[in-house]
Structures are given as C-alpha cells and as structure tokens.
Amino acid sequence: MTRPYLDKTSPDVWKAASALSASIADHAASAGLTPAETEYIKVRASQLNGCPFCLDLHSREARAAGITQQKLDLLPAWRDAELYTDREAAMLAIAEAATRMPLSENSAADLAAARGLLGDEAFAAAEWVAVTINLFNRISILSEHPVRPRDAEGKLVK
C-alpha cells in the first residue's frame, strides 16, 4: 500500500519547507558555495539515506552543475579515490557527518577540518544544505515518491 505524499496532503507545510530550502540555497551561494559543492552534499546524503527520488534528482543536477560521472560513480569510495579537491572532500565529509548521527570522533574531526578549510560562513552554509537535504530525503522516503524512467539524456521515457 502506498503512503500519502506528505507534500500533497500538507501543501502549506511543503510550501514552508520549499521556502526554507530556497533560503538556504541563496545563503549557500552568498557564502561562496558553488552549485556543484551543494550537489555533492545532496547526492552523498541521499546515498546514505537510500532515497531513490532525491538520488535521481540530484545526480542529474550534479551533472548539470559540472560534476563528472566518474566522480558521481565513486562517491561511496571518495576517501580512497584521490579525485576530489579539498573543498569537495569537505562537502562530502559534512554530508556524512550531518547524515550519520550521533557524531563520531572521526566525524567531529572531519567537521573541524572542513571548518578550518572553509571558514565559519561557508562551513555553516554547507551544514544547512546537509540538514535540508536530510529533511527532503525523509519526506520523499516516507511519501514513497516514485522514480520515473529516463533516457541517457535524462528526459522522461513515456
């Protein structure tokens, strides 16, 4: 049995969540995060949470933001791949720390290193992006939002 879509059954709450997401996206951009950097956070958190809808959406948006397919394919092994810049690695570490609770000693160390690299404003903005995608992952998972088939260019297959 399919559960109700939270976004459809509570449209005012969905509108508020969407407004929060838009505000955080604006804040992230003003703090110096690139669209690719925010997509790294969204894709990695969605992988960890097992959210198919958000993975489908944000993988396409990541490619549109310039992230290579190779880097997307290797995200589960990013720490060993040696392909990612220091900033990209910081985004991925933030995504993992914000998604895997409670914070471990390793996660706390990763966050401290990311903060040192990014500075407080960009670091906090990245954390907000991670918090927000975790919210949307849970909405989509609980709503059982479907993933629709797409062709190689990302267009819906009829």
What positions do the PLM features span?
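Hydrophobic alpha-helical segments
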Residues: 1-158
